[in-house]
Amino acid sequence: MSSPIPVVVAGALGRMGAEVINAVVNAEDCQLVGAIDNTPGKEGTDVGLELGIKELEVAVTADFEGCLCAVSQSVRNSDQNAVLVDFTHPSVVFDHTRAAIAYGVHPVIGTTGLSPIQLNDLTEFSAKASIGGAVIPNFSVGMVLLQQAAAAAARFYDHAELTELHHNRKADAPSGTCIKTAELMEEVKQSFNPAEVDEHESLQGSRGGVRDSGLNLHSLRLPGLVAHQEVMFGAPGETYTLRHDTIDRSAYMPGVLLTIRKVGSLQQLVYGLERLI
């Protein structure tokens, strides 16, 4: 049996970080070796005890690069591929991803908010370093299926709008998942929603954000929600609606573990779970 995959989790004490740590601890082929979080007063505490799992003998640290450096050195003379799973904040995810690649640690990025320019920069940087990684807007297999169905339907409908709904602590809008869905639809058709009336918004933004293709994207933020997305197509006499609901974050864990297991064999960054399944 091969050695377990060393895994560092950034955003370890957050809701997604906690789910990831629980999944990693219970996966026989993974080993939690680092827990990064900047929550005040938690430095040096055992992450397992903080999350109510069990004592894991992995201390919480706020030193991101120090943790990556230590993990990188620990696997330098082995055939192991260390992995960083990042669920932090859009403001730091670019720097985190670039640092992981620089240290030879394979990034698995669940934090959304990277711009196309940043994503392109990271892809080129990872290719030069021959360090594989993955930026995954949504780890749900069900969402991948919705996106594929939306791309297929786009061939037949000229009118479509996308709505994503998340908890009110999500920092970015629209979600990376919603943007990715729109991008897949735009690969099939370059222009949507031909104008049939001269629209006027009495409240700016009422029609959502409009992409260059004409697709309208709407974002809702409310307590009680987890992650939900709807794509509605319209044509004379009918509508066609696709919807996916995540009701518990455990739905993401099969996709997270799949990505952890596959990034070590990649030679550059990939975007989207569909690239791995």
UniProtKB/Swiss-Prot annotation:
<dbReference type="InterPro" id="IPR022664">
    <property type="entry name" value="DapB_N_CS"/>
</dbReference>
<feature type="binding site">
    <location>
        <begin position="176"/>
        <end position="177"/>
    </location>
    <ligand>
        <name>(S)-2,3,4,5-tetrahydrodipicolinate</name>
    </ligand>
</feature>
<comment type="pathway">
    <text>Amino-acid biosynthesis; L-lysine biosynthesis via DAP pathway; (S)-tetrahydrodipicolinate from L-aspartate: step 4/4.</text>
</comment>
<keyword id="KW-0220">Diaminopimelate biosynthesis</keyword>
<dbReference type="Pfam" id="PF01113">
    <property type="entry name" value="DapB_N"/>
</dbReference>
<dbReference type="GO" id="GO:0050661">
    <property type="term" value="F:NADP binding"/>
</dbReference>
<keyword id="KW-0520">NAD</keyword>
<dbReference type="GO" id="GO:0005829">
    <property type="term" value="C:cytosol"/>
</dbReference>
<comment type="similarity">
    <text>Belongs to the DapB family.</text>
</comment>
<dbReference type="InterPro" id="IPR000846">
    <property type="entry name" value="DapB_N"/>
</dbReference>
<feature type="binding site">
    <location>
        <position position="167"/>
    </location>
    <ligand>
        <name>(S)-2,3,4,5-tetrahydrodipicolinate</name>
    </ligand>
</feature>
<feature type="active site" description="Proton donor">
    <location>
        <position position="170"/>
    </location>
</feature>
<keyword id="KW-0560">Oxidoreductase</keyword>
<keyword id="KW-0457">Lysine biosynthesis</keyword>
<dbReference type="GO" id="GO:0019877">
    <property type="term" value="P:diaminopimelate biosynthetic process"/>
</dbReference>
<protein>
    <recommendedName>
        <fullName>4-hydroxy-tetrahydrodipicolinate reductase</fullName>
        <ecNumber>1.17.1.8</ecNumber>
    </recommendedName>
</protein>
<keyword id="KW-0028">Amino-acid biosynthesis</keyword>
<dbReference type="GO" id="GO:0008839">
    <property type="term" value="F:4-hydroxy-tetrahydrodipicolinate reductase"/>
</dbReference>
<keyword id="KW-0963">Cytoplasm</keyword>
<dbReference type="Pfam" id="PF05173">
    <property type="entry name" value="DapB_C"/>
</dbReference>
<dbReference type="InterPro" id="IPR022663">
    <property type="entry name" value="DapB_C"/>
</dbReference>
<dbReference type="InterPro" id="IPR036291">
    <property type="entry name" value="NAD(P)-bd_dom_sf"/>
</dbReference>
<keyword id="KW-0521">NADP</keyword>
<feature type="binding site">
    <location>
        <begin position="11"/>
        <end position="16"/>
    </location>
    <ligand>
        <name>NAD(+)</name>
    </ligand>
</feature>
<dbReference type="GO" id="GO:0009089">
    <property type="term" value="P:lysine biosynthetic process via diaminopimelate"/>
</dbReference>
<comment type="function">
    <text>Catalyzes the conversion of 4-hydroxy-tetrahydrodipicolinate (HTPA) to tetrahydrodipicolinate.</text>
</comment>
<dbReference type="InterPro" id="IPR023940">
    <property type="entry name" value="DHDPR_bac"/>
</dbReference>
<dbReference type="GO" id="GO:0051287">
    <property type="term" value="F:NAD binding"/>
</dbReference>
<feature type="active site" description="Proton donor/acceptor">
    <location>
        <position position="166"/>
    </location>
</feature>
<dbReference type="GO" id="GO:0016726">
    <property type="term" value="F:oxidoreductase activity, acting on CH or CH2 groups, NAD or NADP as acceptor"/>
</dbReference>
<feature type="binding site">
    <location>
        <begin position="110"/>
        <end position="112"/>
    </location>
    <ligand>
        <name>NAD(+)</name>
    </ligand>
</feature>
